[in-house]
Amino acid sequence: MSVTEQFVQSVHMTAQDRRITKTRKAIYNAFLQLLDQKDYETITVQEIIDLADVGRSTFYSHYESKELLLDELCQKLFHHLFERAKHLSPQDYLAHIFQHFKKNQDHVTSLLLSKNDYFIRQLRKELEHDVYPMVADELIKAHPTIPHSYLKHLVVSHFIETLSWWLKKGKSYTEQEVIQFYLEI
């Protein structure tokens, strides 16, 4: 299920809610379409409302700013992305993350590759919470003199850079191969 579909399903479907849902979906889809075409920083609210075919006041009645629209996108994306099934091994879980970025490459990956500060900060927070704990014990045992905060920073930064490299240049490798590279280092 795509992020957009999850977004739409999260709203109750009463008569008034349908209008709200339709408007929010139009704004959200316009935003995603613009992310496919250009960097987040260069997107204007005017472009979003023109493409969504809504008025400025309508946009602002749903979102105070394009930053809050980005925030909602990140929340929906990361909720799905980091919702880890308990039966998955760390390698399969990491493959899930890679596959998600590959599947949503256009709009989501553009945020990663453009080094959007907000997106990277949110991604970093999620990785610290969900990915680092999977490798922490082994790393701490292997490197007892290195501060835990540095190890966490190293794991998260390395993951983001590995993901970015794979999306830009390494697609001749499967998700599993790249994850193996990541875990071996």
Language-model features, listed with the residues they occupy:
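Residues in the helix-turn-helix
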Residues: 26, 44, 58-60, 107
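Basic, helix-initiating cap at the start of DNA-binding domains
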Residues: 1-38, 47
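Short hydrophobic/aromatic patch on the recognition helix
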Residues: 53-63
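Alpha-helical structural segments
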Residues: 22-33, 37, 51, 68-88, ...
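Residues that mark the N-terminal boundary/hinge immediately upstream of a DNA-recognition element
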Residues: 44-45, 65
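Amphipathic alpha-helical packing segments from all-alpha helical-bundle domains
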Residues: 116-161
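C-terminal peripheral helix-coil segments that are non-catalytic and often amphipathic
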Residues: 2-7, 165-185
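Amphipathic alpha-helical segments that line or abut small-molecule/effector binding pockets
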Residues: 91-106, 121, 153, 176
